[in-house]
Amino acid sequence: MRTPLPFSTIAAAALALGVLAAPASAAEPTTATLTVTGGALTITVPTDAGSLGTRANTVEGGTISGPLGEVQVNDARSAAAGSGWVASVISTAFTPPSGPAIAASAVGYTAGAIVKVGTATYTANDPPNLTGVAPAVTATGITGDNSATWNPTINVAVPGGMAANVYSATITHSVV
């Protein structure tokens, strides 16, 4: 037969468990952080534009125009709101293997349509000549990463009486 435990024994056991049990603690928050680093500001240009076009030589001269190829600026700097960049361009003279050159002052640049990704205001500046470093496309009011792509047209005013030949120039883009 079972003997019932006296109430005092049960109360003593419950008290002992209560005293020996770990006290409850308040929850403490943990702060976790992460860092997003900015990338680079880069420009990609065609390595070989090929021919801009052909034109018959005339006494009065004329213009030869053609596409240069796709130019792209990628801005992965995660820039703060309001910052921007400027893509610039410069050209050497168009020179033949022998004979007089066509000066860089006769070389113009038209950016054309700009394909945009990200938040910014893009402006095509279309410099009339490339004798010095000239802004081609600017981006202002940037927030975060962005990119712009365009396919510029190069316009060369060929003076009258130029010798029949193949003329070459180096067109250089940069971005800051």
Task: List where the protein language model places each region.
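Intrinsic disorder and flexible/low-complexity segments
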Residues: 122-127
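N-terminal small/polar-rich segments of proteins
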Residues: 25-117, 132-176
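Secretory targeting and sorting signals
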Residues: 1-26
